[in-house]
A protein has these predicted regions:
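Short glycine-centered, acidic/aromatic-flanked micro-motifs in structured strand/loop junctions
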Residues: 18-21, 70-72
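Cofactor-cradling patches in redox/metallo enzymes
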Residues: 30-40, 44-114, 119-128
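Acidic/polar, glycine-rich intrinsically disordered N-terminal extensions of enzymes
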Residues: 20-22, 114-115
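Short, small-residue-biased leader/transition segments that mark boundaries at the very start
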Residues: 2-3
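Glycine/charge-rich, flexible interdomain linkers and switch-proximal surface loops
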Residues: 7-20
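A charged, well-structured terminal subsegment
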Residues: 126-137
Length: 137
């Protein structure tokens, strides 16, 4: 937890909505990623586990998210990541989506139009990189 943050830094904080996708109740990895992102200055909106694509997209809109992070531990729930990415595109949100979890691969992430993160440290690096790329557009 951040105990002190200047007003200027708080205003510049980027927002990331994170969730474990629908059907998946495994959230330890997501919780670690959320903690790491928070410690690196992101405002994390953690929706928890077993979250429907619609709820994730609604939260991204409501919180004016800069990024969305999705987690899945089971191959049977990875398809819900695709549902979320598709809904983000359908709604025209223009928000990058990061995906990760034990069963998620770079090839899968690419196939659904998302950005792959291998672990919590990589998630922080990727989030910063995606934010910087958007800033430079």
């Amino acid at each position: 937890r951040v105990l002190f943050r200047s007003e200027a830094n708080a205003e510049a904080q980027k927002i990331i909505v994170v969730a474990t996708v629908e059907g998946d109740i495994h959230d330890i990895g997501k919780n670690i990623v959320s903690l790491m992102l928070g410690n690196h200055g992101f405002k994390v909106v953690d929706l928890g586990k077993d979250v429907k694509a619609e709820a994730i997209v609604e939260a991204a809109v409501a919180h004016k998210a800069d990024l969305i992070g999705l987690s899945a531990l089971m191959t049977t729930t990875m398809v819900r990541m695709r549902d979320t990415v598709d809904l983000v595109k359908q709604r025209g949100l223009g928000v990058d989506v990061m995906v990760g979890g034990a069963v998620v691969t770079p090839a899968f992430a690419e196939s659904i139009g998302a950005n792959y993160s291998s672990d919590a440290v990589d998630a922080v690096r990727l989030a910063k990189s995606l934010i910087a790329a958007r800033k430079n557009q």
